[in-house]
Amino acid sequence: MQKKSEKIIFTLYLLGFLALALTIALLQPLANTPPLFGNPPDEHARYLIPQFICKYGRIPTGLEEEVRIPAYGFSYALYNVFPYIVQGYIMRFVSLFTQSEIALLYTARLVNVTFGLLMAVIVYFIGKRVFQDDRFRWLFCFAVTYLPEGLFMHTYVNTDSCCMLSTAMMVYALICVYRDGINVRNSLWMSGGIILCALSYYNAYGYIVSCILLFVMFFLQKKESGGYSYDWKKMLKYGCFIAAVVLIGIGWWFIRSYIVLDGDLLGLATREKMAIQYAIESVNPLTMQTYQSMGYTVFEMFRERYTLSGLFHSFVGAFGSMSIYGSIWLYRAYKVFFAAGIVGALLYLIRYKMRRKISGREWFFHINMLYCIFMPVFLTIYYAYTTDYQNQGRYLLPALLPLMYYMIKGIQKLSEISFRGRTFPRWLVNAGIAVCFLIIIGGTIDMVYVRALPVYLETGLVLE
């Protein structure tokens, strides 16, 4: 009976995601649609790349005028474009049967919906490994998969969606390694995550560093007689295997970039040159004003532009070109949710440390996960201060998975607190969990069908 109910919930979990994601993916406009601006951020500029691949059957170098963003003077094709390659070649196949612009756009967007669906499945696998209580396991799964902004990322043409899938793969691989030990299966999971991350999104490269550090540390073992030993043989065996798979997966792209872009592996230097040459004055690197160039401090930037508030609200949910927001109560509810999670996580750490000594391996694992949370935050603030002010919460989404793990673990520990030997009654805990589910699922349904859908229906699927 329990297995049957598990399958039902799992099916509803995936179908709910698909219903919400497809509603957005099939109805939101592509081109700028003032004054409502229901179109996703920069999708029209990103979509140029799969369109180019569909038309010519080859990957653009990023130097072609056809894929250049007119105002900014550079192309997203200079960056890692693996998701666009997948979209472009599938579009090329679909174009054999129809030349409909709508069908081709849907094809590209549905690739990212598929990435989101795969991520939802892996999040379910992670939940099974880290939560024994079914209630909190499902709360974790829904918190990750149904966060409005996270779901939104899987509905339009971008590289963020593939990146989020890659972070789930890497976290799952690390959990399996630390629970079951290293083997070929876990090595392939890790390799796949690293490949997708390396070929999709720079902001998540911290996960690759974390994977390397945690992999190397795994082979450091404490001996019963005291001291430590290191299994060099096994580390080299699996390390070389993972490195070989990763190099096969990503080597072609960086070799190509080195040749095509005159040694510019990441495309950043070429982007700078193109922006200087072609960008309009307001966004040209030579004339563009940043908070750093104007002599402001980071804290003055925070105070003047409400940076942290903007990041939080758009991390929870901001559809369109950051033009469609949820109810104010949605963001207030998430503030309470995160506050409860943080307090619970800290209490858990204090009480857990009092009961038993935390091993060095556990400390190192959690420090790495915290690093994966804070690195995207640091990079977002750094770029906003030094390069181009954009306090968009979507840049923080690589931190979503470990962040939600600690939040749900914290809420779980809050529910287990005892006073004079007495714990909260089960009905009260269940009521609290139900409220969390209401915030997560109800808030997302409200965002999609009450806030966003009327905008999409009013503007229509504008293609150009």
Model-derived regions: residue spans:
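Start-transfer (signal-anchor) and selected internal transmembrane alpha helices
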Residues: 1-28, 220, 231-245, 350-367, ...
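Transmembrane signal-anchor helices characteristic of membrane glycosylation enzymes that use polyprenol
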Residues: 5-43, 52-60, 242-259, 374-378, ...
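Transmembrane-helix signature of polytopic, membrane-embedded enzymes
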Residues: 99-102, 123-146, 165
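Transmembrane-helix motifs of polytopic, lipid-linked glycan transferases
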Residues: 106-130, 169
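Short acidic/glycine- and proline-prone juxtamembrane loop motifs at membrane-interface regions
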Residues: 149-163
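Perimembrane helix-loop-helix junctions
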Residues: 176-179, 207-246, 260, 270
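Membrane-interface alpha helices of multi-pass inner-membrane proteins
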Residues: 186-202, 248
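Membrane-lumen/periplasm interface segments of specific transmembrane helices
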Residues: 237-345, 446-451
